[in-house]
């Protein structure tokens, strides 16, 4: 066999090995995702006796004016309460903490509203045929962020409570625009007036309450959610920074008016640092009986 044939054979073997590793990594990752989703389902808790299973507009009495307008804009009286959701996205993710390194992603997210939790399973296309797999989750009061090249080579693996869990609960709370019945007072959220276009909402999961600022547009729809401080990883160091999500492209899904497009950013001293832009491609709900 000539030298060139040996080279060609070697390249072919490397390509086959690469495909094999990619398939193995995806299989391992998918197994880990199934385990996380099983834990998410196992942590679900029944509603307390007497908790409404359908939205009743009378519970809006006494809420801040912009919050009342919001619920009237996105819910109809008698709407069943969302207990779980499955959300598929496409979009782009900025892989650089300081620059602009946008890469396309696809993801599937499982959400349960009681006990609050989610599992986000994403694939970010770093190189052709070699995605970065990401799990971002809040399960049973604990946060998780795990990223691995090809599902095999770990880039980040953070798990536990503290600021990590708090940050993941912030994500769940901010994304409640996708499952807005979870923001109702009957579902445990407390609202406080700020002005005619904004209000603070507080959610408690476990021991610590979490408060975010919600802003609404002229039509009553939620346009942004802000936290004054969320933990941001820069290298191996966690720093606190304001954090904001913006919502747009509202559509009606199963009787709920929800945003199908959004972006998330850090609000840094040097300016706004957007790192996630996404669009919902599929949205399916599970409702209270």
Q: How would you name each of these model-derived features?
A:
Residues 2-35:
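N-terminal type II signal-anchor transmembrane helix
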Residues 68-153:
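N-terminal mature ectodomain segment of secretory-pathway/periplasmic proteins
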Residues 82, 108-120, 133-146, 194-198, ...:
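Short, solvent-exposed coil/turn segments at beta-strand boundaries
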Residues 146-205, 238:
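Flexible, processing/modification-adjacent segments and terminal tails
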Residues 200-287:
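Gly/Pro-enriched, hydrophobic low-complexity segments
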Residues 29-86:
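N-terminal leader/targeting segments and the immediate start of mature chains
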Residues 127, 151-154, 230-232, 266:
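Short, surface-exposed beta-strand-loop junctions and turns on beta-sheet-rich folds
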Residues 64, 192-196, 226-232:
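Short, positively charged
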């Amino acid at each position: 066999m000539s030298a060139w044939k040996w080279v060609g054979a070697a390249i072919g073997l490397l390509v086959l090995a690469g495909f094999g590793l990619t398939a193995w990594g995806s299989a391992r990752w998918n197994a880990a995702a199934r385990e996380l989703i099983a834990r998410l389902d196992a942590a679900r808790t029944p509603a307390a006796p007497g908790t409404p299973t359908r939205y009743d507009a009378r519970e809006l009495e006494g809420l801040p004016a912009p919050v009342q307008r919001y619920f009237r804009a996105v819910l109809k009286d008698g709407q069943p309460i969302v207990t779980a959701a499955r959300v598929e996205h496409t979009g782009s993710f900025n892989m650089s903490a300081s620059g602009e390194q946008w890469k396309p992603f696809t993801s599937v997210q499982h959400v349960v509203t009681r006990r609050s939790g989610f599992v986000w399973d994403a694939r970010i296309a770093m190189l052709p045929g070699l995605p970065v797999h990401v799990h971002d989750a809040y399960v049973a009061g604990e946060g998780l962020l795990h990223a691995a090249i090809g599902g095999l080579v770990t880039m980040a693996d953070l798990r536990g409570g503290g600021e990590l869990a708090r940050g993941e609960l912030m994500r769940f709370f901010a994304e409640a625009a996708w499952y807005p019945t979870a923001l109702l007072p009957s579902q445990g959220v407390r609202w406080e007036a700020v002005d005619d276009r904004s209000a603070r909402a507080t959610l408690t999961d476990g021991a610590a309450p979490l408060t975010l600022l919600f802003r609404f547009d002229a039509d009553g729809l939620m346009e942004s959610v802000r936290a004054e401080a969320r933990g941001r990883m820069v290298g191996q160091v966690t720093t606190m920074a304001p954090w904001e999500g913006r919502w747009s492209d509202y559509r009606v899904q199963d009787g709920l008016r929800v945003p199908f497009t959004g972006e998330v950013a850090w609000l840094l001293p040097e300016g706004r640092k957007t790192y996630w832009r996404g669009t919902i491609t599929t949205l399916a709900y599970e409702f209270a009986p």
